[in-house]
Amino acid sequence: QIEEMKSHADDINFEVAKEREKVERHDVMSHVYAYGVQCPKAKGIIHLGATSCYVGDNTDIIIMAEALKLVRTKLVNVIAELAKFAEEQKNQPTLAFTHFQPAQPTTVGKRATLWMQEFEMDLEDLEYVLGSLKLLGSKGTTGTQASFLELFDGDQETIDKIDPMIAEKMGFKACYPVSGQTYSRKVDTRVLNVLAGIAASAHKFSNDIRLLQHLKEIEEPFEKTQIGSSAMAYKRNPMRSEHIASLANYVMSDMMNPMLVASTQWFERTLDDSANKRL
């Protein structure tokens, strides 16, 4: 049975699953069915004792961890570039502003360290959240592992090995010690808060660049063939900074989504998160 399952681990029969979902209206069970068609000998043990959240929630945590690692790499690169710029411009005098009114002298490099420091704060938050991410593991329908107690005839010693084995297999240090049917949706709020924090720092940076471009102190790259406006081709709009601000607004506004989901989970779980969590 196990060898049969291994032989079909990567050739997912999406067409069979798609047609089955029209009947069952359940994404995970449709794939369980499709896997069973490919592995008739193992059909009776596929997904045995598990839940849909064992599949979906553990996958989501893995995806979030990989995504945060990607964001971390890009964030470190941004900090490095800002540090380089700050060093190069540390003696370049400029006028500081408070309330966007002329204040006292500073340097271009000093101002850049303000941007850099906020991204460094975001990096600290990201490292903490990434380091604290754990898998759901396999806790059963309500977090008690009752199905495994039955499958293993009450052998608690064997059951206690399940979550550590899952964590090790998936490259994590541990699984959350307790859960309902799902991992706590507070986890999602942590991740989105980090992303929203990065977005806020990026937005502040883009604001300053746009204001400085208006003052003719710093200007975005402008290509030879670039057109500033369909009606005013001579314009040199700060479109890169505007793109940053626009995307940052979306990320920051999305921060409320997981907060609302976490606050409306009833007891061991509800399905309020089914659609918007995927978005």
Residue spans for each PLM region:
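Acidic, glycine-rich loop-and-beta core segments that form the ion-binding/anion-interacting portion
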Residues: E157-M255
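Glycine- and acidic
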Residues: A17, A65, R185-L192, L271-D272
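A helix-coil-helix interface module used to build multimeric assemblies
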Residues: Q1-A146, F152-A167, G228-S229, M239-H243
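Generic structural signal for well-ordered, non-membrane alpha-helices
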Residues: N77-A80, K84-E87, M121, A200, ...
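Long, amphipathic alpha-helical stalk/connector segments used for oligomerization, subunit docking
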Residues: Y250-L279
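Short acidic (Asp/Glu) and glycine-rich catalytic loops that position anionic groups and cofactors
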Residues: A9-F14, F222-G228, S263-L271
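Short alpha-helical linear motifs
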Residues: H26-V28, L215, W266-T270
